[in-house]
Design a protein with these regions (language model features):
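A beta-strand edge to alpha-helix "cap/lid" segment located at domain peripheries
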Residues: 2-34, 41-135
Length: 135
């Protein structure tokens, strides 16, 4: 019995997103970058407005890793995946719990949207967008 290509693609995307989140928690830069396109584009919560290219994306994590090292958390929830034959997107929520030592009680939940494209038969992240609601 053949598996539905859409469900196979969805399972691959979910696995890729979960492995990315695990890599973030482990501060494993090579695993974080493993499925990103060299010319990827990112919109993040902190400035700048956009990051173009894998090296700019790599550099952005240097601001976040110290926060994790102090006990911050990074957990995905409400993951939803939509796939086509060669493009897909995923959206989820990222709960960022404050480090215990920060004294802050207001954890942050941000929105995540990731755009994927099939490149040489592999799902590749071409766009990543993190945002929070404007007040």
């Amino acid at each position: 019995m053949n598996q539905n290509p859409t469900s196979t693609n969805e399972a691959q995307i979910r696995e890729l997103v979960e492995s990315w989140a695990t890599a973030v928690r482990n501060k494993d830069m090579e695993a974080i970058l493993a499925h990103h396109a060299p010319d990827m584009l990112m919109f993040d919560v902190p400035p700048p407005l956009q990051l173009k290219g894998i090296e700019a994306y790599r550099a952005s994590w240097s601001k976040f890793f110290p926060w994790l090292e102090r006990g911050g958390t990074f957990e995905l929830s409400d993951i939803s995946v939509t796939t086509g034959s060669d493009v897909a997107f995923c959206h989820a929520l990222i709960h960022c719990g404050n480090p215990r030592s920060s004294g802050r009680k207001d954890d942050l939940t941000v929105r995540l949207t990731i755009g994927f494209k099939q490149v040489n038969g592999e799902w590749t992240i071409v766009h990543e967008h993190h945002s929070e609601p404007a007040e």
